[in-house]
């Protein structure tokens, strides 16, 4: 989809991103959200500011360090690994396209427009995807979803009524007060008392009689 946006920008005489999106909606008429099957949404991810996400290079290094074996495996490991593979391949193709445009597009203004669009707009979307799936594999999907809700509540609360610092994902499981639905705290049933063969008093009386 994003590659088609770029093709429209390059080929149109009056290129606009809005026009390419309208054209795509007319062609397909689909509203695809890459986070929907994981319980999140593009809107929820948009609560996090753009400078929150590490660079693509750092995220790719993290994915390689933590999940390289699973990402290179021919077997299906998890939906998050599959999504990571697709995002990594997509970013690689975008870099190839940006390099090709920079080398072959004669108009400097158009060349700068395309390269900037790839690095800024599409780069942010790839950073969001990489961060989400790496975090789900590291901390667990439920923890990441709780974090997104907590951050969304924090960022939309007026500064005078919220804590000075935003929630931190790595410490969320220790500080969260939200209880999971459908689970009640377990009550320990009292264990049956064991019968004592002889009470302490009886033992003492027997010992005294033996001494006499």
UniProtKB/Swiss-Prot annotation:
Annotated site, Cleavage, chain positions: 183-184
Record key words, sorted: Disulfide bond, Host nucleus, Host-virus interaction, Repeat, Secreted, Signal, Viral immunoevasion
Region spans: Disordered: 165-212
Sequence repeats: 184-190, 191-198, 199-206
A GO term from the CC aspect: host cell cytoplasm
One BP term from GO: symbiont entry into host cell
Top-rank lineage group of the source organism: Viruses
Signal peptide from the UniProt entry: 1-19
Main location, first listed in the record: secreted
UniProt subcellular location: Secreted; Host nucleus
Region 3 X 8 AA repeats of S-P-R-R-R-R-S-Q: start-end pairs: 184-206
Residue numbers covered by the propeptide annotation in the UniProt entry: 184-212
Biased composition (Basic residues): 178-205
Ranges for region HBEAG: 25-27
Record PTM text: Phosphorylated. Cleaved by host furin.
SUPFAM superfamilies for this protein: Hepatitis B viral capsid (hbcag)
UniProt key word Disulfide bond: yes
InterPro entries registered for this protein in UniProt: Hepatitis_B_virus_capsid_N, Hepatitis_core, Viral_capsid_core_dom_sf_HBV
Record-stated family: Belongs to the orthohepadnavirus precore antigen family.
Known role: May regulate immune response to the intracellular capsid in acting as a T-cell tolerogen, by having an immunoregulatory effect which prevents destruction of infected cells by cytotoxic T-cells. This immune regulation may predispose to chronicity during perinatal infections and prevent severe liver injury during adult infections.
Protein name: External core antigen
Lineage of the organism: Viruses, Riboviria, Pararnavirae, Artverviricota, Revtraviricetes
Name of the gene this protein is made from: C
